From Swiss-Prot:
Residues 1-22 form the signal peptide. It comes from the Eukaryota. Keywords: Amphibian defense peptide, Antimicrobial, Cleavage on pair of basic residues, Secreted, Signal. GO terms for cellular component: extracellular region. Residues 30-41 have a biased composition (Acidic residues). Expressed by the skin glands. This is Cruzioseptin-6. Residues 24-44 are annotated as: Disordered. It comes from Cruziohyla calcarifer. Belongs to the frog skin active peptide (FSAP) family. Cruzioseptin subfamily. One of its GO terms (biological process) is defense response. Transmembrane segments: none annotated.
Length: 75
């Protein structure tokens, strides 16, 4: 009976250890995925910021050009 108890405790202990290791690996994978998602969203945000700044610059240049044309037409 004692031999059976020891075997049972050993099996339970090894099962808990392997479960713990699997959960730790799963957490690490989730953290890596979250980090990759964060990196991708930062890249998208940076790209959108560049597009926004370029759009503003183009809009200002076009507005200045139209204003100059109107001023020249009035003279």
């Amino acid at each position: 009976m004692a031999y059976l108890k020891k075997s049972l405790f050993l099996v339970l202990f090894l099962g808990l250890v392997s479960l713990s290791i699997c959960e730790e690996e799963k957490r690490e994978e989730e953290n890596e995925e979250e980090q990759e998602d964060d990196d991708q969203s930062e890249e998208k945000r940076g790209f959108l910021d560049v597009i926004t700044h370029v759009g503003k610059a183009v809009g200002k240049a076009a507005l200045n050009a139209v204003t100059e044309m109107v001023n020249q037409a009035e003279q």
